[in-house]
Amino acid sequence: MKLRSTALVKGFRQSAPYVNAHSGKTVVIMLGGEAIADPNFANIVNDIALLNSLGLQIVVVYGARPQISHLLTSQGYTTPYHKGIRVTDARALELVKQAAGQLQLDITARFSMGLNNTPMAGAQINVISGNFIIAQPLGIDDGIDYYHTGRIRRIDIDGIQRQLNQHSIVLLGPVASSVTGECFNLTSEEVATQLAIRLKADKLIGFCSEQGVIDLDGEVASEMLPNEAETALQRLIEAQEDDCGTARFLRGAVSACRAGVPRSHLISYKEDGALIQELFSLDGIGTQIVMASAEKVRGAGIDDIGGILDLIYPLEQEGILVRRSREQLEQEIEQFTIIERDGLIIACAALYPFPDEKIAEMACVAVHPDFRDGDRGVILLNRLRQQAKEQRLKHVFVLTTRSVHWFLEQGFIESDVEQLPMAKKALYNFQRRSKILVLAV
């Protein structure tokens, strides 16, 4: 008898909305030399190939900093850095080209694998590299001549887009030529960032040794706005870690975000499957830098009824919430406020006003179990209090059997049935014996 894995089926079904959401989207992936040297790199290539098969348009930008440094050291040669950028003289340039060229061949070979019983079986991926980027010299800064270190002059966006439209993966490295036929050493951060901006990419993805950006509590920050990412970058600079992979990515991510790239993701190159977990699960695994929060608080509409029913059904089954039918929700949908994340309703609450008695009921408060550690309940409470104020009401009340302490922590006080509005008092269920809690608006 064949073994059946319900976990596989469940995971596949849960990922379906993300497969649909990401299909056809443009993603720029920045692979530093550290990621390429890690034993997990083969799995990263497999995961990128999977993204390609799912219809994502992918540009891979690889760096070669540790490989270049190793090659220079093996030749007994060192190069100075100025403002975190390598000064590349003529001798160093030859070694840079050697290291970058070797990596290009190795990465292309990885994507070309097609052995049976491997994740690459039948993939048949076309990897395209070329002179899509034209460079120019970085010049002299503070009296320091960068020689053959350069920056981007222009990018052939149309040429890259043609390759992406043909379902090819575009692979670009840290060496580009100029209009004079010279070669220049570029930073992979600049290449990836500028590509993401000019391609109007949907995502910029980078890899570091950690799971993402580590906050002051030692935890992975799941989401950051650009100003928060800048603060994290400043902490790294003050700790003299401004040359680490996280710092280099954050610089690019902040620039990309402010130039219109909706999301940048930072994940670990050591974690097997991090790329898939980040893109195809509700809360991801790393850190994303976003133009605006991925969560939106808004009034509910008819199209949200299915999502609200899915959210509250488990709580109704446990007896925590009173059951609401689809028909009832359709009639009352304008009373609901929701928190939405990536198209999924993760929290809801409703406000039912009794204007004659200057009071309103806060009801059907529910938060998705994966997001109960945050302050989403408080966010909904504050939004509903504001709505009550705007309606010139003086109090809100709740009926609850399980969440008494949480409401008390938010400033509610216990009351009794006599304090309920007349219409609600007539419907009070004495068998359920819900606690009545009231809060001044």
UniProtKB/Swiss-Prot annotation:
InterPro entries: AceGlu_kinase-like_sf, Acyl_CoA_acyltransferase, Asp/Glu/Uridylate_kinase, GNAT_dom, NAGS_kin, NH2A_AcTrfase. It is an enzyme of class 2 (transferase). It is found in: Cytoplasm. The keyword Acyltransferase applies. Keywords: Acyltransferase, Amino-acid biosynthesis, Arginine biosynthesis, Cytoplasm, Transferase. GO terms for biological process: L-arginine biosynthetic process. It catalyses: L-glutamate + acetyl-CoA = N-acetyl-L-glutamate + CoA + H(+). Residues 295-434 form the N-acetyltransferase domain. Pathway: Amino-acid biosynthesis; L-arginine biosynthesis; N(2)-acetyl-L-ornithine from L-glutamate: step 1/4. Belongs to the acetyltransferase family. ArgA subfamily. NCBIfam families: N-Ac-Glu-synth, PRK05279.1. This is Amino-acid acetyltransferase. It comes from Photobacterium profundum (strain SS9). The gene is argA.
